[in-house]
Amino acid sequence: MNSKEIIKQLEQAGWVLRNVKGSHHVYEHPDRPGHISVPHPKKDLGIGLAQKLLKQAGLK
């Protein structure tokens, strides 16, 4: 899974881009605490990182 696919899923679930710091896009959700930092652009994220990001977002 690449970062573009992760970002698409986050945005569909209501996560909003808060800021960009270097090569990381930081997303926050209006109803959920915390934030999620996605390395972008990155062609392939490791399976563990992709699953961790989706779990943090409540999508898995």
Residues of each region from the PLM?
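Cytochrome P450 catalytic-core helices
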Residues: 22
